[in-house]
Amino acid sequence: MSDWTPSLYLHFAAERSRPAVELLARVPLENIEYVADLGCGPGNSTALLHHRWPAARITGIDSSPAMIAEARSALPDCQFVEADIRNWQPKQALDLIFANASLQWLPDHYELFPHLVSLLSPQGVLAVQMPDNWLEPTHVLMREVAWEQNYPDRGREPLAGVHAYYDILSEAGCEVDIWRTTYYHQMPSHQAIIDWVTATGLRPWLQDLTESEQQHFLTRYHQMLEEQYPLQENGQILLAFPRLFIVARRTE
């Protein structure tokens, strides 16, 4: 599991794209020239940006070679760069930095967010969506299984919180619009939940395990999911998925 798997990620393309659509709807920009899509993945969010601003110069950034290859194939009119978000430097100030479900993987948000604001043009916008599910059973159980089986903690850190992000971005010279939404995704089975998180949040926990260790981990994880996520009357499972949204406009 050394690289991301675009096909697995896109298995839930509609569910993963919906937050990007709703984030983009709140971006208060019309005619813009330079856009960066940070953590563009296979290009599903980049396609939304290209549709809204077809004349803009859009650059997608991702550290995964497989994701970049998929995005280039899907969107030949956009530029894609394989790079670490923390180190990438645009050649010009950006009118929009769009980061859908990517910045939660990076540490030091107290430094990262002001840095991203510094890359914006005057009145430029930083638009961010991050999964806020560190305390949800899906992620709590990952940590519990790892503890039970004596595996190292590979999970990401929790988000800083609404008040912290507001202060960080206000102090960086931005007007801040921030909100939190919980989606309830209808899942046909507990295995479907595993398929969902295997493409994202579960990857760090599995990537250094042997095949037999992975199977042992997933078997126990499946058992614990069954305890935490009961079936609805129609046999479906409702997967609660909180997400944090931020639209920060530079005023300085």
UniProtKB/Swiss-Prot annotation:
GO terms for molecular function: trans-aconitate 2-methyltransferase activity. Its main location: cytoplasm. This is Trans-aconitate 2-methyltransferase. NCBIfam families: PRK01683.1. It comes from the Bacteria. PANTHER family: TRANS-ACONITATE 2-METHYLTRANSFERASE, TRANS-ACONITATE 2-METHYLTRANSFERASE-RELATED. Pfam families: Methyltransf_25. One of its GO terms (cellular component) is cytoplasm. CDD domains: AdoMet_MTases. Keywords: Cytoplasm, Methyltransferase, S-adenosyl-L-methionine, Transferase. Belongs to the methyltransferase superfamily. Tam family. The gene is tam. HAMAP family: Tran_acon_Me_trans (MF_00560). It catalyses: trans-aconitate + S-adenosyl-L-methionine = (E)-3-(methoxycarbonyl)pent-2-enedioate + S-adenosyl-L-homocysteine. It is found in: Cytoplasm. Its EC number is 2.1.1.144. It is an enzyme of class 2 (transferase). GO terms for biological process: methylation. Catalyzes the S-adenosylmethionine monomethyl esterification of trans-aconitate. The keyword Transferase applies.
